[in-house]
Swiss-Prot record:
It comes from the Bacteria. The gene is rplP. Part of the 50S ribosomal subunit. Coiled coil: none annotated. Belongs to the universal ribosomal protein uL16 family. One of its GO terms (biological process) is translation. Pfam families: Ribosomal_L16. This is Large ribosomal subunit protein uL16. One of its GO terms (cellular component) is cytosolic large ribosomal subunit. Keywords: Ribonucleoprotein, Ribosomal protein, RNA-binding, rRNA-binding, tRNA-binding.
Length: 144
């Protein structure tokens, strides 16, 4: 499971997810990618479930890149605890994903296999996603 080795602070503010992703909106490493269409927190368990779904479908072929990392801790208070008395204990880790971010990339397989693998991965995530090719994003090719 993905998580930071060490962090400066155990608890973080929730923050806001306004606007579109600044970077990571194009397919750089692989040939095909899975692009987020909505803002969300993606947990390390969801990332791992999506990775397993992709690699199981592709069997031995292809390479997968995970372009998001769960670096933000989220906290939760125990059940039936009254309000107040401090912030809850760290519960897990999330990656903040904004619309336009390419979360996963695949190379070394045919387009049909990549499309199906990324479709299976998208069902493990709590947001709407889009299949993108390397040359499609932005309307022109990436070679220039």
């Amino acid at each position: 499971m993905l998580m930071p080795k060490r962090v400066k602070y155990r608890r973080e503010h929730r923050g806001r997810m306004k606007g579109r992703a600044k970077g990571g909106t194009e397919v750089h490493f692989g040939e095909y990618g899975l692009q987020a269409l909505e803002p969300a927190w993606i947990t390390n368990r969801q990332i791992e479930a999506a990775r397993r779904a992709m690699t199981r479908y592709m069997r031995r072929g292809g390479k997968v890149w995970i372009k998001i990392f769960p670096s933000k801790p989220y906290t939760a208070k125990p059940l039936e605890v009254r309000m107040g008395s401090g912030k809850g204990a760290p519960e897990g880790w999330v990656a903040v994903v904004k619309p336009g971010k390419v979360m996963f990339e695949i190379a070394g397989v045919s387009e049909e296999v990549a499309r199906e693998a990324l479709r299976l991965a998208s069902h493990k995530l709590p947001i709407k996603c889009k299949f993108v090719k390397r040359e499609e994003i932005g309307g022109e090719s990436n070679e220039s």
